[in-house]
């Protein structure tokens, strides 16, 4: 059911779904006789939120990979994860990361007030610069020989060369959240960083001493260099806690009384206004229904409502209603 979610409209998926028993039986036979071969992926272009290359795989390959990921790979490799490794995991995700960040900010405020800085580390080209040997070495530590061989066969079929992955695959996402697991433990256990959070390749460290943050940044850079990464100097910064900072789509500010405010950044608001204009224009031309446009708008409101956005949602709602007049 999970594998066909979002792609049931495709003719190939419909055919597989109608003949599911025969198709699955055929897959099992090939796996048992050792004649299974991974299908070649088809390159696609992903346009939102930014243009990038991706891969599309056949449903039978998706089922096979999902079985490995859910039953062996993820359970084996996620046992060592720290709680503040927040991306792409059961019971975690972007909302969990935001809650953890607010907890870290509150705990820091209780001890140091507004005295402190926030270090934000962004890795340059995380997936495009991901070394294949580093990923395989990570998987090797947690998998038995047969599963490790199956995983390597999948990765080698989908990705040629020695560097770079596309982030669409579930297996590659598992690689993304696990490859920096050693860095997480190094920061927490060797550097004794108390307020540390990572969402995929976006790292947050909160500390009352700016010089200590500079030292931590140097140590993080050294660790990243060992596995072929470098930091994005344009996005990596140290910001005074009193000024606020942007993380995962929201601007975080701590008031003098310790209240933590979450507001959408201006780029998100500007983007939503333009998107609403396009949706209403398409609906008026009959290319989509008004219900579809309303659904997209409600989805944005639900996300905005996770922060302190009551007045903003009211303004954008009025703006959206005016577009229909």
Show the residue positions of the predicted features.
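A short, aromatic/hydrophobic, helix- or strand-capping loop or linear motif
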Residues: 80-84, 151, 229-234
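Right-hand nucleic-acid polymerase module
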Residues: 57-58, 66, 154-161, 166, ...
